[in-house]
C-alpha cells in the first residue's frame, strides 16, 4: 500500500526536485579557466627549466643523475670536459612527449640545475616543438628565476 502511495504521489520525483532546488541556489564550484586561475601548490610540476648561478654560469655539472633516474627515458645528455677540468653539458635534451612529470630529475640533481616550473600552459604545433634543448631550458630558467627561487624557498622547510 505504501508503495502504491509513493508511486501515485511521485515521491522520487519530489525528492529529486528538492535536491535540484537546494543545489540551484548553492555556491557554484565552477572555475572559468582562461579568465580565472586555480591556486597551485609550491610543489606543482610543470614545464622544465635549467638554472644558472648568480654569476651567469650554468648549474648543470653533467653528472647525468637525472638521465639515469628518469623512468620515461625522456632526458638525453652529452657532456664534455673543460680546460679547467670541470665537466659541463654539450647537449641537454628533454622530450616532453615522453616525460611523465614525476619530478625524479629535480630530486636527483645535486646542484638544483633542473627544475620543474609552475608553467602548464604550453603547446606544440609541429613535431619538434615539445623537444626541449639546452638553450630553450636555460631561457625558461632565466625568465622565471625569481619565481623558481621563491617556490624553492617556500618548499625548503618540508624537504
Curated annotation (Swiss-Prot):
Keywords: 4Fe-4S, Cell inner membrane, Cell membrane, Iron, Iron-sulfur, Membrane, Metal-binding, NAD, Quinone, Repeat, Translocase, Ubiquinone
Keyword Transmembrane helix on entry: no
Domain (4Fe-4S ferredoxin-type): residue spans on this chain: 50-80, 90-119
Main subcellular location: membrane
Cofactor note: Binds 2 [4Fe-4S] clusters per subunit.
GO biological process, one term: aerobic respiration
Compartments where found: Cell inner membrane
GO cellular component: plasma membrane
Taxonomy, superkingdom: Bacteria
EC number: 7.1.1.-
Binding site for [4Fe-4S] cluster 2: 70, 99, 102, 105
Catalytic activity: a quinone + NADH + 5 H(+)(in) = a quinol + NAD(+) + 4 H(+)(out)
Entry cofactors: [4Fe-4S] cluster
Positions of [4Fe-4S] cluster 1 binding: 60, 63, 66, 109
Membrane topology: Peripheral membrane protein
Keyword hit for Metal-binding: yes
Function of the protein: NDH-1 shuttles electrons from NADH, via FMN and iron-sulfur (Fe-S) centers, to quinones in the respiratory chain. The immediate electron acceptor for the enzyme in this species is believed to be ubiquinone. Couples the redox reaction to proton translocation (for every two electrons transferred, four hydrogen ions are translocated across the cytoplasmic membrane), and thus conserves the redox energy in a proton gradient.
Assembly notes: NDH-1 is composed of 14 different subunits. Subunits NuoA, H, J, K, L, M, N constitute the membrane sector of the complex.
Similarity comment: family membership: Belongs to the complex I 23 kDa subunit family.
Protein name according to UniProt: NADH-quinone oxidoreductase subunit I
